[in-house]
Design a protein with these regions (language model features):
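Conserved beta-strand segments of alpha/beta enzyme cores
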Residues: 3, 78, 135-137
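A short, charged helix-loop
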Residues: 75-93
Length: 184
């Protein structure tokens, strides 16, 4: 069974998570944003979290443009700070939008103030959780990860995947598929 819980207006990822509070029923849970594309399974990350005492595990990935993402600062193997789209990034480790969370996050979200975007930011919730009890771990995605939040990102990801796995593409008809400027 699949259960959909609708967020009627964009009020932030933390707000969307809060809408799921009753559904989660006081169990650890996974948040996987729908615009993520990854190459490998996250099963091991999930199992590690389920068997841990952590309040959260955040999946991170190195990026070339850190000011476009939530960024985690790591010192001595621990997350020390999480910042949403920093103007001056403290690292190049992006928060991927894949979160393993304990229900303690709901108490943190309850006390969040809206950001400058008038949203309840998951990065603020995680940073507050970090300051409260410093019980957040992280895992790094070292293979393929792509945030496809824009149409250009979707096209770019399609091109990358097709070029690496041409055998996955089924061809129908006689025309070639072209991805590029001014295509129709």
């Amino acid at each position: 069974n699949i259960t959909y819980i609708k967020q009627d207006e964009p009020r932030g990822i933390a707000h969307a998570i809060m809408l799921c509070k009753e559904f989660v029923n006081n169990e650890k849970f996974l948040v996987f944003l729908g615009d993520n594309i990854i190459q490998k399974s996250i099963k091991n990350f999930v199992e590690n979290f389920k068997n841990s005492d952590y309040d959260a595990t955040v999946l991170l990935c190195k990026v070339d443009n850190p000011s476009s993402f939530g960024i985690a600062d790591i010192k001595d193997g621990k997350i020390t700070k999480i910042t949403e789209k920093p103007k001056e990034p403290i690292s190049n480790l992006a928060v991927t939008g894949i979160y393993l969370l304990d229900p303690v996050i709901f108490e943190i979200i309850d006390n969040l103030k809206p950001s400058w975007r008038n949203e309840l930011e998951i990065t603020d919730a995680l940073d507050n959780l970090l300051r409260k009890n410093n019980n957040i771990s992280y895992e790094k995605i070292t293979d393929y990860w792509k945030d496809t939040g824009t149409p250009q990102d979707i096209l770019h990801a399609n091109g990358e995947i097709i070029s690496k796995h041409p055998d996955f593409v089924r061809r129908h008809g006689s025309n070639k598929v072209i991805i590029g400027k001014n295509c129709k």
